[in-house]
Amino acid sequence: LAAVEGNFASFLNSLSSVNADYNIGVAIADDGCFSGGVWLDPTQAYIDQLLILNEMIYGVTAFPGNYTERAFNLFESALNPVNLGAGDCNEGFLRDDALLALIGVSDEDDQSYGYWLDYVLYFQSLKVDPADVVFHAIGGPPPSGCDMALYYSGMYEAVAWTGGQFISICEPDYSAALTSIAEGSVNVMLAFPLSDTPIPETIVVRINGVVEKSGWNYDYNSNEVVFQTNYIPVGGSSIEIEYTITGDCN
């Protein structure tokens, strides 16, 4: 966990670069309530996020129990309706329109009580589209782990099944790997296809009702409006694209 914390800046910077609207919680205790009674989101200042993360990992509520090596059971507890309901500890964390990324960290095999695929299918059932669930993990690689860790069996299979990122816990530097995990944990809309062929100079793009004259371009080949990396709309934004159709006399 110390190595993850030390490289967490790479994770946050990657999310910020695409204006991701994220919630990041850390579940350590058996009840699944997020450590510190809070989660990270883009409204918090960067320095505050690092302080909150430290409290999540090392604070008084970060008390491991029977689920220490049972990531699937921890995920199940955290996302249990008992914890997600009104007034409950993780209320508001799970969102219908957001990708659900579940990240396990361990130097042992996963010892959850059930079979890994049953857990994957359960978490996929929480979303309208099963593809909106992805597992990532930091642990011992197959087939026999590495110098300081056993093979992270169960979690490795869940990562492979959902197309996530698996990082060897024996890697000396997690920064690049955490960047990859961040990129694989968000749905980024860079391009918006148009239903008709426009006269390019008539295209008007509005984000939350405000006309944006820069930060995007029209791709003739794909017939899409494509946003540049530093101008990607924040998650949940309203995007409106107006244009005159080729051959339209009106």
Name each model-derived stretch:
Residues 1-222, 233-237, 241-250:
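Divalent cation-coordinating acidic motifs and surrounding scaffolds
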Residues 224-229:
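Extracellular adhesion/glycan-binding regions together with long Ser/Thr-
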